[in-house]
């Protein structure tokens, strides 16, 4: 352990040995270290972080991972450009309005997770990817199944259904392109032989999972933080222009449903491509390394009063979207939908409150830390 952080041995959720990196400076440094990658030299026998079909183990070719990743980001530059994001804003705003109106029409009380947190980011990703509206309900259900951490068979079945849907969508886009990510990738693929339909489906599924399950967890976290911190909720309600700062603080802070800080496990699996030293310990090639992002985001050496939820916090260099080569490509989309949601929510539902004590809520541990089984609310 050093003043900049620590690297400790632990057992991953899959029951296998791993290293856990803690501390803001060390986490940030190692996230940008090219010796730690998402691929593994022996992908058939790696240590796994969790058991879901998509995210629990390695991804990519160890001999070409960096080159492939740089090419992928270059191909998607147009899809996530400032111009495209601004063109998306009214469409995302419409989806936010439809989701909130749907909860209001359903009446009080409601399950906020089922009415808002789960459908909203999935619908936004469907809009971004170009998934047809008739397919979206099934698409969201398969997405939920695919990230089941405790049921590998269900996870695999959900992933296979998603791939079939993506394949059909790609076929349609070959015939009639639109202003969406899949169409952009098909156009870029005309000049890049490596961009096969399977490669495009793989990239699209990665974008979906990055933008759906994780953003649903942030929305769950955000509503619970706001409804359990009266002064901060009132500040945002009085000044919806605080939504950008509030969203950054929601991204930084832990959910009220998460374990105490000392008991949290890490996320973001990486594999050492060579032997290396970090935090005073020796990490061997092939070892699984995980990052305690939440610990880093509460590091008192970086954040003033880190345990305080402050919707007006000004300096907030959190690592919720990772850092370095693998910084979240869809961060701008996630920020936009979160800002639109939390900028509108309390104006439309000024009396919104939890309908049960916080202690009665249960985290959805088998899917994503901090996500709730349900969030009963009333207004």
Where would I find each of the regions flagged by the language model?
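Cytochrome P450
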Residues: 1-379
